[in-house]
Curated annotation (Swiss-Prot):
Name assigned to this protein: ToMV susceptible protein tm-2
Location(s) in or outside the cell: Cell membrane
Domain NB-ARC: 162-388
One of the record's GO molecular function terms: ADP binding
Record's bilayer topology term: Peripheral membrane protein
Family note: Belongs to the disease resistance NB-LRR family.
Subunit structure: (Microbial infection) Fails to interact with the tobamovirus mouvement protein of tobacco mosaic virus (TMV).
Coiled-coil residue windows: 63-83
Organism lineage: Eukaryota, Viridiplantae, Streptophyta, Embryophyta, Tracheophyta
Any one annotated GO CC term: plasma membrane
BP-aspect Gene Ontology terms: defense response to other organism
Function recorded in the entry: Potential inhibitor of viral mouvements which may confer resistance to some tobamoviruses but not to the tomato mosaic virus (ToMV) and tobacco mosaic virus (TMV).
Residues given in the record as ATP binding sites: G185, M186, P187, G188, L189, G190, K191, T192
Length: 861
């Protein structure tokens, strides 16, 4: 959509203006003025677009056409900036005088064209009376329907019985913290239906009650007035002083209030000034529903949260059946053919466990013949039909996102349905596309700001959490099928993303492509074989089994490509030839190679000076030339497996570019680097390094790391692979920020308490000799939550996890993972004091014959 392109333009103009100021100084003040004008004008246009979208949704074709013009303008401006920035950098590198260069004159001419187009858009807006918009009538109708539903006698719940019983007990518990229950979850899960049934069941146990729909654009005065009328405040008291009289009454009454669909915390800040706290001696209760977990957390605390989940398949079919037959128990599947029943099950399954989708679909089917042919037609068109019925409810959550977060959400459209996506990938692709920028004066890194956006998407229940890291951060996530459909539709509508199927046979659409994903090798080969013009392409995702993928790509100059992701899914190792034309992708910022890929990046990579992330999967064997260090913006170099790190790119020969060519403030991840290329001055130089892996650690490296002052200070993750027994004592006690430590050694190594960082949360030991001395040290680590021991040798057959006389043993440990132990036959913990927080014991790999004490047996199931 237009606002997404405008956001990208604004962010890129900020970057270019900063580069001009730093690199060229007063010499280019006139050029910086043009960039600043672009930035200001795009901000104003974006504000107008955000308001105008409501009128577009209402069906105003004039606004729709105007927004299309604005979108095309924003796209052309982005193309201009992407083409212009590399020329600034090249000109600066070779000390050309920009003012006299031809491209600077060309840029000035393009700016004048843009100014004329802006004036023309404003003329059209005024000429055809396309004025600023009022509230969208459709939204008002939707809000009114929700208010009616809130008071309707609809209390049938399917698949939520356990949730209902749990919440009922919680509400009637006298010790309920804050007196608040927060029902949260993604749109369509039945939060309001469940809350209504709870409210109606318990309200007779209170002196007064009220239920209010809050909405996305609430007015505190109207909400308080609604509550006052329902709890019995007299008209006179309302007219005298609504707030004071309402608060006074609620202080002495035992009440229950349901606040449905709260979108943000600001409205609660207004309401709580009047509504007294529920945890008073009176014993009042508050039920809230929200799409945003952070809202519930803010109002009632963490303990108030109750997150609804999609229905299981049988419960989905049960609800589907009830809605098909209008809850008439006398009419069921008894007279239906087995084929029709199976089609019905498939239709219910396509709804993804979302009650709203099931209800909408059943409503469509009730208006059709109950035949296999009619239902099959619905099944075949499920994606569109269900989406149409749920679109407004789901789209409200999207429209509520901050403008800057919307392209981040749409990025999920590039992935297949139900695909687990690493947070690291999303964060760095967002940064590569300039969706995330650090404003001047903000000391936080772009990665931190991007992580905030991801956390917000999860809190709003638009994205589902898949895995967390050792320290509670999001490790991976996925998007629900129904929301994925919405995401894809929105992305295609705005020309944000397409598949090859969408644009085949239409050269005009192909030429406008900005992001494309291939899931099929045949489609990919046919598409590239059609010789498409891909001059505007920014992002290319290829999920493929074809080793010749790079040969297909060699026919094109992806001069504006920012992001390239190649996922090779075949089971065998495939050698790929990456041609030298790979170096023509001079705008490339993010490169990810995943799967069984074997090959070498060409020396022309030296031209990819804007690369920020290189991510090589553990299954890939990719050699990097030394030219990679010419990418002075490089932030993350990730070899997921240390076996790949024996790589020529790490040479520090003075004849080739090397790691010292990098800007010292940029590099954050270096995983792995061979120790023979590791020097003391390197660590002192890389001041923002957060993740470091060293292969073949030497005594000199141990000595460097064990100094009293941490180098670097920002280090959070450290992985060390030893090939020999170090004579130097490891001392990492001066690294307070390290929370994850991985040690791999083939020989015996003595470690005392000073070997470990004071705040370590996750520790992995590989091929260690584990004895009682080492175990005694591990037991005392105060913040250790996860301990993983892989292929370790045990010089004692029995590993006793209990503490000494004082019982002090693994005070924070939650997960103990033992993989393929050697020489271990028994693991015991004979008291209830040791490991008080242990939740799980994992025995994996070859571990036959290991006996466990009773407590550990329960935790290993």
């Amino acid at each position: 959509m237009a606002e997404i392109l405008l956001t990208s333009v604004i962010n890129k103009s900020v970057e270019i203006a900063g580069n001009l100021l730093i690199q060229e100084g007063k010499r280019l003040y006139w050029l910086k003025e043009d960039i600043d004008w672009l930035q200001r004008e795009m901000r104003h246009i974006r504000s107008y677009v955000d308001n105008a979208k409501a009128k577009e949704a209402g069906g105003d074709s004039r606004v729709k056409n105007l927004l299309k013009d604005i979108q095309e303008l924003a796209g052309d401006v982005e193309d201009l900036l992407d083409d212009f920035l590399p020329k600034i950098q090249r000109s600066n590198k070779f000390n050309y005088c920009l003012k006299t260069s031809s491209f600077a004159d060309e840029f000035a001419m393009e700016i004048e064209k843009i100014k004329r187009r802006v004036v023309d858009i404003d003329r059209i807006r005024k000429t055809y009376n396309i004025i600023d918009t009022d509230n969208n009538n459709d939204d008002c109708v939707l809000l009114d329907r929700r208010r009616l539903f809130l008071h309707a006698d609809e209390t049938e719940i399917i698949g939520l019985d356990d949730d209902f019983n749990m919440l009922q007990a919680k509400l009637l518990n006298q010790d309920l913290h804050y007196g608040v229950v927060s029902i949260v979850g993604m749109p369509g899960l039945g939060k309001t239906t469940l809350a209504k049934k709870l409210y109606r069941l318990i309200r007779d146990q209170f002196e007064c009650s009220g239920l209010v729909y809050v909405s996305q654009q609430p007015r505190a005065g109207e909400i308080l007035l609604d509550i006052a009328k329902q709890i019995g405040l007299t008209e006179q008291k309302i007219k005298e002083n609504l707030e004071d009289n309402l608060r006074s009454l609620l202080k002495i009454k035992r009440y229950v209030i349901l606040l449905d669909d709260i979108w943000d915390v600001e409205i609660w800040d207004d309401l709580k000034l009047v509504l007294p706290e529920c945890d008073s001696k009176v014993g009042s209760r508050m039920i809230i529903t929200s799409r945003n977990s952070n809202v519930g957390r803010y109002i009632g605390g963490e303990s108030s949260l109750h997150a609804l989940q999609p229905l299981e398949s049988e419960k989905s079919f049960e609800l589907f059946t009830k809605k098909i037959f209008n809850f008439d128990d006398n009419n069921s599947w008894a007279n239906a053919s087995p084929d029709l029943v199976n089609i019905g099950r498939n239709i219910a399954g396509r709804c993804g466990g979302i009650p709203l989708a099931i209800v909408v679909t059943a409503g469509m089917l009730r208006a059709r013949e109950r035949t296999e042919h009619a239902w099959n037609r619905v099944l075949e068109s499920m994606g569109h039909k269900v989406q149409d019925g749920c679109a407004k409810v789901l789209a409200l959550s999207y429209n509520d996102l901050p403008i800057a977060s919307r392209p981040c959400f749409l990025y999920f459209s590039l992935y297949p349905e139900d695909h687990e996506i690493r947070a690291f990938d999303l964060i760095n692709m967002w940064i590569a596309e300039k969706f995330i920028v650090v404003n001047s004066g903000n000391r936080r890194e772009a990665e931190d700001l991007a992580e905030d956006v991801l956390n917000d998407l999860v809190s709003r229940n638009l994205i589902q959490l898949a895995k967390r890291t050792y320290n509670g951060r999001i490790s991976s996530c996925r998007i629900h099928d129904l929301l994925h459909s919405l995401c894809v539709d929105l992305a295609k509508e705005s020309n944000f993303f397409h598949t090859a199927h969408d644009v085949f046979g239409d050269p005009g659409n192909v030429a406008r492509l900005r992001r494309i994903t291939f899931y099929s090798d045949n489609v990919m080969i046919e598409f590239f074989g059609s010789n498409p013009k891909l001059e505007k392409l920014r992002v290319l995702f290829c999920f493929t089994k074809d080793p010749s993928i790079f040969s297909h790509m060699a026919c094109f100059d992806f001069k504006l490509l920012h992001t390239l992701v190649v996922v090779m899914s075949q089971s065998f190792q495939a050698y790929v030839t990456i041609p030298s034309k790979f170096g023509n992708m001079t705008c490339l910022r993010y490169l990810k190679l995943e799967g069984n890929i074997c090959g070498k990046l060409p020396n022309s990579i030296v031209k990819l000076t804007r690369l920020e992330t290189i991510d090589i999967d553990r299954r890939s064997l990719i050699q990097l030339p030394s030219g990679v260090w010419e990418s002075k913006h490089l932030r993350h170099l990730c070899y997921r497996d240390y076996g790949q790190a024996c790589n020529s790119c790490f040479s520090i020969s003075s004849f080739y570019p090397n790691i010292y060519s990098l800007h010292p403030n940029n590099l954050q991840t270096l995983m792995w680097i061979p120790d023979k290329f590791f020097e003391p001055r390197l660590l002192h130089r890389l001041i923002n390094l957060r993740k470091l892996g060293i292969l073949g650690v030497s005594n000199s490296t141990v000595k460097i790391l064990s100094t009293c002052r941490p180098v670097p200070k920002a280090l959070k993750v450290l992985k060390l692979r030893f090939f020999s027994d170090p004579s130097e004592q490891i001392n990492l006690s001066s690294y307070p920020k390290i929370v994850k430590l991985h040690l791999n050694v083939d020989r015996t190594i003595a470690l005392n308490s000073e070997a470990f960082p004071p705040n370590i949360i996750k520790l992995t030991l590989v091929c260690f000799m584990v004895d009682s001395c080492l175990l005694a040290v591990l037991k005392t680590l105060p913040k250790l939550r996860k301990l993983k021991m892989v292929i370790c040798k045990y010089n004692e057959e029995k590993m006793a996890l209990s503490g000494e006389a004082n019982g002090y043993s693994f005070p924070q440990l939650e997960v103990l993972h033992i993989h393929s132990p050697n020489g271990l036959s028994e693991v015991t913990c004979t008291d209830d004091v040791s490991m008080p927080k242990l939740k799980k014991l994992l025995l994996t790999g070859f571990h036959c014959g290991i006996s466990l004490s009773e407590r550990l047996k329960k935790l290993s199931k």
